[in-house]
């Protein structure tokens, strides 16, 4: 069979742009080292995480070659020498001689180098060595996602190493990890079906740890809704340490204790109230530190309310200071070392940020973890002064969320470009010590995890263009160029469509049925599904499971959901005039509802032979509030009608002009900046922003040109609608501003996000609607003369403003969710 997966170029290409250059080949050539009959040597004193990685290398070698190989031999005579600085004497000698000098004093760095007729994998520390081993296996063709996304492994007769030295340097972010969260019902059911337990035991976590390490991560917050990592299986912590993964506990689980350890024993521990129950809670905290003593684990400090809630209605800074002081005293007493010798993190999540804003400060060695707003936008960044803190800053980012205005648990709704833009923002403003990603059930967030981990290694490798190329490289690591290119485009397009409105927020009222907007968006998904199916037919059987999980299922599931709600909208619209065609649309709703269940069932029981049974049982149809507290997916309401015997200069159209922000007439950029177009980012096309955000905006401007001569009506003013991304005031300036002026007239100042805050009185009236829709629409009214050609100028006064669309209304514009189809344009 002619294969289209795993071309030589594809194997050589690595998933992340941060990886070292290709060095594994499958055909002999000049200046290569053969691994035919290779053996491996390493010091028995190596940390268990290195020895585990070597064991995986041996297994991977056998998977690729089909032969038992890489037998271990003593001493330093193996074909492959693996070792860590300070542990392996031969490695230390090479460092001293200058062969591996670039490892000295480095963190988590590896060097892969041919020295004589040996291949050396050396690490500056234990994780550096592990990362070097997994870089080799990845280039051999074993994807980090071989287990979690069923990436097939192609066999080769022989393996060759191009002679030279290879590395990808040190990580830019010190702690790079995942948070398993909101794990019921999907992950919990899958674990029960797969491992036979009602909790995540060490067999499950071993799979998670291996994925993290193969992605060059080093950190995990374990699942905590109903599970207790430490208490459920004592082997969990042991395996984490053996594999070299640093553990922590989530933002509301202080002192290395899982919340379930308290929740299951409330009678023993008493009220979760430090003012009234200090003695018991201190004892609870102390046990956590005693258990993690001697590990690399990171201790969460501070305290939130019982069960991921606020501790009180107001920020009691004095109480929080007391709690943190006592926690640090316990850390010092238990470890026998100053508290600053144990890495600690304080998470400014939701209401906890109020403590910081109210003036509470923690010791300088404590890392401060900033959060996004659960919808992918950074809430705030440290000031220039704050960035100098010894403890540094971290970011807690979400691609899964349970909470208002609506859960996002079923599918990945995070745009690649949004994650890139916001993580770049975070890094540029000094958030560089910890990045942790809330991934829900882990699946189906495979690609966001890959991008997050790759960016955490070196964010500066990424630009607007290269982040789009990253998606292509991700699929090219599995398929040939033609298939990978189409798969990447389908994936990115689906992310763009998903970000318009989440599946949980989507309903019959979302889009305008009268203007044709609903038909347009449903057609968008129908065309995308057809593309996805056509591509599926071109993929060999052994590589289809990966494609079904990451591309085909999400597209089909959403295309069907759009069909269902479009049919419901048509049914309700036609039923108001007693049109009997409403009944046909009612039947369509029922068909789509049933198809949704069949698609999910196929994911659970058919993909990879039923390997992922339980992963796709999340409710997503029937939300009425933020939570999924309804029994099961609910058939949307329909009406039945009784049947008896018995429809870059723009030209105005229909009384308005709609312009994509990308289609400007001209631009002006300040010194050191440029206007950057983010593809796939807007509601309908793209978005535009002045970059970098760290530079002064100066006199930067966007100019648009339009012709109103086709309008017969008389008017003295125009209403200009400016649509921007719902960026938060991350600089804490009192809101970001831009100006709008017409034909050189007096500019009007617009502050678009001053009230975009998650607290009263703006939470329900402005914040939730804006973040759910992901855009802010502001309207200004400007005087106009009756000439034909007009020029509109928009000037940002603050950095970080992302423009999506502009509508100039001369009296004919009707409000639409996607702000109307773009007007006719000439260039």
What are the residue ranges of the model-derived segments?
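Conserved, mostly hydrophobic/aromatic
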Residues: 61, 125, 368, 438, ...
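Feature activates predominantly on carbohydrate-active enzymes
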Residues: 99-275, 293, 345-349, 359-377, ...
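Structured mid-domain segments that build the active-site/substrate or prosthetic-cofactor binding neighborhood
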Residues: 213, 218-221, 227, 370-376, ...
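Gly/Pro-rich turn-and-neighbor structural signature
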Residues: 159, 231-234, 239-242, 269-390, ...
């Amino acid at each position: 069979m002619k294969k289209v997966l795993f071309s030589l170029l594809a194997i050589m290409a690595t998933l992340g742009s941060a990886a070292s250059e290709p060095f594994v080949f499958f055909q002999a050539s000049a200046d290569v080292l053969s691994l035919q009959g290779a053996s491996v040597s390493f010091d028995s004193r190596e940390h268990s995480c290195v020895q585990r990685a070597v064991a995986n290398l041996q297994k991977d070698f056998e998977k690729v070659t089909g032969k038992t190989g890489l037998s271990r031999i003593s001493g330093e005579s193996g074909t492959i020498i693996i070792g860590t600085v300070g542990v392996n004497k031969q490695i230390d000698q090479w460092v001293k001689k200058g062969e591996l000098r670039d490892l000295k004093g480095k963190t988590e760095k590896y060097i892969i180098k041919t020295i004589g007729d040996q291949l050396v994998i050396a690490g500056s520390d234990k994780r550096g060595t592990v990362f070097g081993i997994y870089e080799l296996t990845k280039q051999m063709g074993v994807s980090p996602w071989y287990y979690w996304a069923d990436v097939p492994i192609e066999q080769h007769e022989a393996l060759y190493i191009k002679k030279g030295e290879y590395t990808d340097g040190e990580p830019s972010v010190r702690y790079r990890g995942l948070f398993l969260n909101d794990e019921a019902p999907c992950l919990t059911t899958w674990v029960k079906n797969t491992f036979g337990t009602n909790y995540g035991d060490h067999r499950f976590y071993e799979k998670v740890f291996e994925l993290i390490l193969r992605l060059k991560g080093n950190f995990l917050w374990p699942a905590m809704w109903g599970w207790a990592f430490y208490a459920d299986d004592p082997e969990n912590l042991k395996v984490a340490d053996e594999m070299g993964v640093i553990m922590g506990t989530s933002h509301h689980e202080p002192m290395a204790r899982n919340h379930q350890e308290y929740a299951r024993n409330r009678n023993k521990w008493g009220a979760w109230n430090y003012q009234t129950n200090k003695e018991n809670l201190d004892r609870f905290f102390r046990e956590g530190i005693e258990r993690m003593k001697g590990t690399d684990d990171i201790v969460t400090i501070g305290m939130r309310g019982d069960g991921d809630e606020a501790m009180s209605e107001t920020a009691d800074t004095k109480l929080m200071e007391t709690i943190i002081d006592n926690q640090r005293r316990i850390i010092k007493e238990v470890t026998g070392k100053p508290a600053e010798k144990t890495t600690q993190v304080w998470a400014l999540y939701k209401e906890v940020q109020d403590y910081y804003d109210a003036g509470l400060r923690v010791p300088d060695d404590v890392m401060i973890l900033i959060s996004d707003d659960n919808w992918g936008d950074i809430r705030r960044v440290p000031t220039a002064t704050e960035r100098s803190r010894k403890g540094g800053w971290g970011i807690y980012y979400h691609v899964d969320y349970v909470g208002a205005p609506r859960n996002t648990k079923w599918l990945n709704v995070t745009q690649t470009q949004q994650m890139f833009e916001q993580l770049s923002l975070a890094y540029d403003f000094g958030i560089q010590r910890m990045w942790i990603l809330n991934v829900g059930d882990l699946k189906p967030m495979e690609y966001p995890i890959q991008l997050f981990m790759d960016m955490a290694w070196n964010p500066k490798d990424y630009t607007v263009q290269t982040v789009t190329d990253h998606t292509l490289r991700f699929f090219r690591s599995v398929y040939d160029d033609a298939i990978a290119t189409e798969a990447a485009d389908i994936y990115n397009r689906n992310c763009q469509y998903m970000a318009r409105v989440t599946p949980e927020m989507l309903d019959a009222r979302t889009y305008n049925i009268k203007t044709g907007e609903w038909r347009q968006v449903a057609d968008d998904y129908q065309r995308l599904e057809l593309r996805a199916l056509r591509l599926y037919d071109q993929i060999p059987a052994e590589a289809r499971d990966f494609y079904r999980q990451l591309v085909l299922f999400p597209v089909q599931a959403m295309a069907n959901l759009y069909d269902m709600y479009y049919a419901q909208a048509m049914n309700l619209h036609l039923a108001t005039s007693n049109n009997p065609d409403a009944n046909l649309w009612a039947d369509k709703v029922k068909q789509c509802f049933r198809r949704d269940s069949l698609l999910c069932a196929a994911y659970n029981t058919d993909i990879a032979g039923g390997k992922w049974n339980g992963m796709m049982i999340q409710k997503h149809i029937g939300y009425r509030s933020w939570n999924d507290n309804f029994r099961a997916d609910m058939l949307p309401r329909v009406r039945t009608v009784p049947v008896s015997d018995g429809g870059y200069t723009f030209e105005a159209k229909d009384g308005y002009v709609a312009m994509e922000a990308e289609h400007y007439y001209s631009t002006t950029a300040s010194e050191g900046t440029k206007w950057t177009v983010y593809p796939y980012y807007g509601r309908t096309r793209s978005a535009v922003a002045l970059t970098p955000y760290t530079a002064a905006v100066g006199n930067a401007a966007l100019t648009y040109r339009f012709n109103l001569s086709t309008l017969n009506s008389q008017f003295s003013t125009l209403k200009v609608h400016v649509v921007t991304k719902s960026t938060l005031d991350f600089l804490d300036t009192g809101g970001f501003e831009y100006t709008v002026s017409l034909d050189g007239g007096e500019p009007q100042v617009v502050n678009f996000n001053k009230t975009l805050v998650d607290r009263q009185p703006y939470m329900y009236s402005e914040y939730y609607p804006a973040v759910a829709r992901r855009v802010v629409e502001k309207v200004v009214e400007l005087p106009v003369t009756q000439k034909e050609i007009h020029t509109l100028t928009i000037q940002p006064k603050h950095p970080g403003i992302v423009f999506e669309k502009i509508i100039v209304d001369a009296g004919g514009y009707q409000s639409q969710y996607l702000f109307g189809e773009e007007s006719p344009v000439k260039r």
